[in-house]
Amino acid sequence: AKNYPTVSGSDHLRQVFXMGLSDQALLSDPVFRPLVEKXFFDDYAXRSGFEG
């Protein structure tokens, strides 16, 4: 089973997506960056329907 972020972490991700930040900004985000490094983003994007 994969480890998903806490509720607060998920809320933060939704806020970041909503802001429409660039990939550079996302990668520099202290909360988002660890998820990118864990390959979590692809799964999150698919579940949320988010497309870069």
From Swiss-Prot:
| Highest taxon of the lineage | Eukaryota
The remark listed among the other comments is: On the 2D-gel the determined pI of this unknown protein is: 6.0, its MW is: 27.2 kDa.
Full protein name: Unknown protein from spot 415 of 2D-PAGE of etiolated coleoptile
